[in-house]
């Protein structure tokens, strides 16, 4: 899982006049290199990341377990879905660029088999 630099650049250049909701689709590793479950490691990451999210005005607005796939391919099997709202794109980018947050991100990477992070804004 790597950051798509072209998408991130495009994201940063969009109008920044409304909140942005980051849709997180997560598939956990069964077992991480440390021997813990991916879900346990991700839970620790989420606890450690929460202060960074709050610091820029972000908030978790919904989370849930992905339990039925009415329309999806085999590769689209996620374990968890999170919606995190930020007051602006700039706020999200500020958090992303924090060296301390980048350190915390290592747990996220250790926990996940794969993930998707989709930026979304409200239709006006």
Range-by-range predicted roles:
Residues 83-85, 90-124:
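Short, Lys/Arg-rich amphipathic alpha-helical interaction segments
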């Amino acid at each position: 899982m790597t950051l798509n630099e072209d998408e991130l650049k495009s994201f940063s250049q969009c109008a920044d006049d409304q909140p942005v909701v980051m849709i997180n689709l997560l598939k956990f590793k069964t077992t991480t290199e440390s021997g813990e479950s991916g879900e346990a490691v991700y839970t620790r990451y989420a606890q450690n990341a929460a202060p960074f999210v709050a610091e820029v005005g972000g908030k978790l607005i919904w989370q849930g377990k992905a339990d039925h796939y009415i329309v999806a391919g085999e590769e689209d099997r996620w374990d968890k879905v999170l919606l995190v709202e930020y007051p602006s794109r700039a706020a999200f980018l500020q958090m992303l660029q924090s060296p301390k947050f980048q350190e915390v991100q290592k747990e996220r990477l250790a926990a996940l088999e794969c993930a998707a992070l989709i930026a979304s804004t409200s239709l006006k």
